[in-house]
């Protein structure tokens, strides 16, 4: 019996030694640093950063802008929680530089921007847009607030959150339901083009509206004329709020969407449930046809917007019928 016990102990010792050896070999050949998975503000003061593996860090590893202080740091496996003071405003950009290490000492230095926590995200629709702008009426996108809230941190993409040509993050701004916001996507770059956060009549510039809130896309080039995806998210890396897909369907390339990037974006929005059609996967026939539109024949929803995430929500108004900053026209252009 004693001999059997001795043999069992030897076997257990060998198993433990083997496991330790394998772990040691694994650590010896682990040369990869942790990678960022996600980051977001989870409250006005707390930031959550997630990595691909367990990490270690100390307060001295982080650098914040002047006026911001790191008051606490908590490491929970792959998650890192930072408490920042004073609290950030909704959508306020916070540049953050930091460094973390894994259990064998591989380190990652990173720089990212976290947008202030917004607990009052409104329901917002992309409500009107033009893709065939002119020198006197450049391309614009209008947003309509279905409910009241703060648009701080909301982000518009020409594209999607993972692949885009142009983007704009809105600053903190409390607005009532029924408000209109205009994003001018091809500004002239003149001093009068002011992002309005206190006075809706403050901005000049082409097609600015005295009672809507005007914003100007820096270095904006306008929108793609024939094929494109427009999206609105709660924040960079956040939840999809609204999407629009348009295509003339005249191209023979990439299933009618002309470019691979557009096709990929269409598929991404479809997977998120942001756009629907009779076909699956979506084809250009399921999308808005922008071909009859012009700089003043905008593509818009009804005056009382409907949102079924289909092309049936949309029409092209008659010539001169664009109404950026006010209720949409229900007149329909007939070629």
Q: For the regions a protein language model found, what residue spans apply to each?
A:
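Bacterial N-terminal signal peptides that target proteins for export
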Residues: 1-8
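C-terminal motif of bacterial Sec signal peptides marking the signal peptidase cleavage site
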Residues: 16-19
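A structural motif detector for short, solvent-exposed N-terminal "entry" segments of globular domains
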Residues: 21-30, 40-42, 107-164, 219-226, ...
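Short, surface-exposed alpha-helix to beta-strand junction/turn motifs within ectodomains of secreted
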Residues: 52-72, 154
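Short strand-edge motifs at loop-to-beta-strand transitions and within beta-strands
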Residues: 78-82, 181
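Solvent-exposed beta-edge/loop recognition patches
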Residues: 87-90, 172, 177-335
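Short, solvent-exposed loop/turn segments at the edges of extracellular beta-sandwich modules
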Residues: 100-106
């Amino acid at each position: 019996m004693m001999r059997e016990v001795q043999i069992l102990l030897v076997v257990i010792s060998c198993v433990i030694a083997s496991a330790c050896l394998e772990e040691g070999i694994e650590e010896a050949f682990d040369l990869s640093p942790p990678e960022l998975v996600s980051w977001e503000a989870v409250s006005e003061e707390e930031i959550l950063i997630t990595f691909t593996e367990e990490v270690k860090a100390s307060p001295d590893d982080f650098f914040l802008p002047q006026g911001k202080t790191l008051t606490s740091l908590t490491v929970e496996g792959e998650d890192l929680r930072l408490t920042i003071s004073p609290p950030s405003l909704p959508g306020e950009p916070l540049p953050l530089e930091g460094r973390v290490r894994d259990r064998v000492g591989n380190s990652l230095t990173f720089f990212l921007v976290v947008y202030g926590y917004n607990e009052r995200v409104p329901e917002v629709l992309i409500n009107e847009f033009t893709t065939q702008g002119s020198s006197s009426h450049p391309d614009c996108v209008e947003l309509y607030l279905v409910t009241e809230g703060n648009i701080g941190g909301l982000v518009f993409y020409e594209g999607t959150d993972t692949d885009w040509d142009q983007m704009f993050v809105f600053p903190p701004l409390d607005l009532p339901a029924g408000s209109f916001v205009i994003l001018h996507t091809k500004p002239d770059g003149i001093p009068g083009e002011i992002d309005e956060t206190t006075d809706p009549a403050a901005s000049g510039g082409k097609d600015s509206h005295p009672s809507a809130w005007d914003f100007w896309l820096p270095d904006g080039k306008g929108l793609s004329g024939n094929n494109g995806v427009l999206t609105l998210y709660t924040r960079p890396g956040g939840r999809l709020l609204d999407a629009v897909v348009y295509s003339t369907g005249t191209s023979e390339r990439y299933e009618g969407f002309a470019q691979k990037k557009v096709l990929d974006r269409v598929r991404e929005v479809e997977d998120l449930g942001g756009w629907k059609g009779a076909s699956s996967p979506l084809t250009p026939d399921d999308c808005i046809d922008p071909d009859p539109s012009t700089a003043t024949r905008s593509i818009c929803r009804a005056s009382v917007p409907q949102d079924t995430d289909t092309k049936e929500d949309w029409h092209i108004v008659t010539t001169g019928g664009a109404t950026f900053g006010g209720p949409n026209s229900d007149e329909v252009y007939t070629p």
